[in-house]
Amino acid sequence: MSVPTVVNIAKKETLLPYKYQYAICTFVTNWDEYGRMLDSFIAAGFTTDDCEYRYADNTNGNSFDAYQGINQFLQNADAKYIIICHQDILLKFDKRADLDRRLAELEALDSNWAVAGNAGTNNPYLLSMKITHSDMVTHKVGVLPSKVNSLDENFLLVKKSANLALSGDLSGFHMYGTDICLIASCLGYNTYAIEFSLQHLSMGRLDASFYALSKKLQTKYARFFRGRYIKTTVTRFYLSPNRLVRAVMDISFIQSIVRLYYKCSYKWFKKY
């Protein structure tokens, strides 16, 4: 087949510019609350000239859970940066120009970042955040920006080019800030808490659904990060965070024993 014929059939892949700089995506259960949030964003400089606003309508029941809806946002938004935020936040302090500057600083610090937020943690005891709640008390702790492994869900910002998605085997309205950070890390990206000061009108609820989903997320990732053999069509190796375990399990003699075990197990199950 000639080159001209191929060109007529196939489409050459190119990097297309995004239509918008920011997409602001929200789950809506209360139109008045969402309207106040939207007005505060526009007043802060997120105008429709180069920003799009998307919402998932949950005013008549949960048409979307967070994982399903956010995956829709991440797939459909045509913006360089995708903001996923609660409907009960107000941009009373920092503005669009502040966020532009913070992201430029973050890009200079680490161009391999994929997710940012205003509150997160990078170990069991150290928080990094700046946020004001409905009592107008500003809570600022830790160092910003700071690399984290989990982010609060009130305000998340995702770099579209990272091509992230949330887990397909989790559902509900909690822990997706942790899930997206873990997935970004698995894909080779970093996640950060940055300084972007806003007002969050609620403190969140740690109800039974929170603890149930937290348990599901723990179970999912405990299984995902388990030690195990990986067999390709041309090689095999053992995955483990422990270097010594990897070295032992990759010894040819050990692999031979494991291979014999699986072969015998397969024959036994096939027989019965």
Task: Give a label for each model feature.
Residues 86-90:
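The conserved acidic donor/metal-binding loop of glycosyltransferases
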Residues 1-43, 54:
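N-proximal low-complexity "stem/linker" segments adjacent to membrane-targeting elements
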Residues 60, 94-131:
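Conserved donor NDP-sugar-binding/catalytic core segment of glycosyltransferases
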Residues 82:
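Short aromatic/hydrophobic "clamp" motif used to bind/position activated sugar donors
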Residues 129-149, 153, 163:
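Short, flexible, basic/aromatic active-site loop/helix in glycosyltransferases
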Residues 61-77:
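Glycine-rich, basic loop-to-helix element that forms the pyrophosphate-binding segment
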Residues 151, 156-163, 170-197:
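A short, conserved alpha-helix in the catalytic core of glycosyltransferases
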Residues 192-221, 232-238:
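Active-site donor/metal-binding and catalytic loop motifs
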